[in-house]
Each structure stands twice: as structure tokens, then as C-alpha cells.
A protein has these predicted regions:
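Short alpha-helix boundary/capping motifs
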Residues: 33, 150-151
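Active-site lining segments that contact anionic ligands and/or coordinate catalytic metals
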Residues: 141, 153, 200-203
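Phosphate/ribose-recognition catalytic cores of enzymes acting on nucleotide-derived substrates
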Residues: 161-203
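Conserved active-site beta-strand-loop modules that form the wall/rim of enzyme catalytic pockets
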Residues: 142-144, 154, 165
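Polynucleotide-recognition surfaces of large bacterial nucleic-acid defense/processing enzymes
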Residues: 147
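Short beta-strand segments enriched for Tyr within beta-sheet-rich domains
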Residues: 152-160
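RNA pseudouridine synthases
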Residues: 1-139, 143, 160-161, 180
Length: 203
């Protein structure tokens, strides 16, 4: 495997390095199957075995992943994350429009015992808070800026699904269907000789 498989580096200095992780790549080894390729495996193979990931993103989520180059830097940055002194912003395209243009979703979530690796809203779970703002509306879809105030596994996806706005193409908490131009553009006409392809589809 060549270093070309490493995601693009968007920032680096003597203490940290930030990668633009693509959708479909784990950040760290999977608990169920540690052999699945992940970002830290690539970083350790091609850059340094001493780097640490400061946080994680879901496999299906693309975005910036920050890595510390030393243990003291990791401890310092981890403290900032734990103290909620780091602002995290996600952009989500949903199927369904929130009832309000902005708000805070407060729902307790916990692991789903019937579906290993997945989460669910449950009154006995841990309290989670997700703030959102509608950036733009597309008929029955919405583009949201999302700010998780807490950091539970799959929190954003579970919370958005809970208010009837699952993330497009989310097969775990939504219908898994892609987004088609015909769903957004009025009077859209598709060539009869060609099937319509999704603008955004499943991995």
C-alpha cells in the first residue's frame, strides 16, 4: 500500500497534523473487525507510529481528523475536547425538514442491544445534545449546520432520525436511499433510455 492512500493533509506543524478523511474510511481499528483499513493504520505505516488521533468521525462521515504528534499534545487537546472548549461543525443533508429552522435536540441515547454497533434513543441512555440550524431548504430536504454539544457514537445521525430528518443515504438510521435530481428540481425530465442516477448514494 502506498502513501498515496493517505487522505490529504490540510494542516501540519510541529505538534499536530490534520487530515481530510473521506467517507468510507474508519479513523481507528474497528472493534468487531480490526483488520479493516483505517486512517491510523495508514498514518502509522507511512508517517509515524507515534501519532495519535485526538477524536473520531463515523466511517460514513467525511471531514477533518486531528492527530497529535506526541503524548503530551494528545493529553492537552483531549482535555479541550472533554471540557467542550472545541467547536465542532458538521454539514448534513437530510430527508425531511425540521419543524423549526433552528433548535437543540435533547434526547438520551444508548447502544441498541438488538443491533450490535448501532445506537438508539432510550430514556435510560446518556443525555445528548445536538444543536442545528437550517442553511437551505430543497423541497422535502434540508441542508443543516449541526453542532454536537456532546459526543456519543452516531449522535447526530440518531438525533436527526429521531426528529424525522434522517441523513441522506444513511442505511442504519434512515431508508438508505440516495438523493435524485428529480426529487429537487421541478418538472425534471429524465431520458427514457437512461435510468436516473443518484446525486448522492450509499457507499
Amino acid at each position: 500500500m502506498s502513501s498515496a492512500h493517505l487522505p490529504p493533509v490540510v494542516y501540519e506543524d510541529d505538534w499536530i497534523i490534520a487530515f481530510n478523511k473521506p467517507s468510507g474510511l474508519l479513523v481507528a481499528p474497528d472493534r468487531w473487525d480490526p483488520k479493516i483499513e483505517n486512517l491510523m493504520q495508514l498514518v502509522h505505516e507511512h508517517l509515524s507510529p507515534d501519532y495519535f488521533n485526538v477524536h473520531r468521525l463515523d466511517k460514513e462521515t467525511s471531514g477533518l481528523v486531528l492527530c497529535a504528534k506526541t503524548k503530551p499534545v494528545l493529553d492537552s487537546l483531549s482535555g479541550l475536547f472533554q471540557a467542550a472548549r472545541v467547536t465542532k461543525t458538521y454539514v448534513a443533508l437530510t430527508r425531511g425538514v425540521p419543524a423549526e429552522p433552528s433548535g437543540v435536540i435533547i434526547k438520551r441515547i444508548a447502544p441498541d442491544p438488538r443491533k450490535p454497533g448501532l445506537m438508539k434513543v432510550w430514556s435510560g441512555g446518556k443525555r445528548c445534545e445536538t444543536e442545528y440550524e437550517v442553511r437551505e431548504l430543497f423541497r422535502r430536504h434540508a441542508l443543516l449546520d449541526v453542532h454536537p454539544r456532546t459526543g456519543r457514537t452516531h449522535q447526530i445521525r440518531v438525533h436527526l432520525a429521531a426528529i424525522g430528518c434522517p441523513v441522506i443515504s444513511d442505511a442504519f438510521y434512515g431508508d438508505g436511499c440516495g438523493l435524485f435530481l428529480s426529487q429537487l428540481k421541478r418538472r425534471y425530465k429524465q431520458k427514457k433510455s437512461e435510468p436516473e442516477r443518484p446525486l448522492i448514494g450509499r457507499l
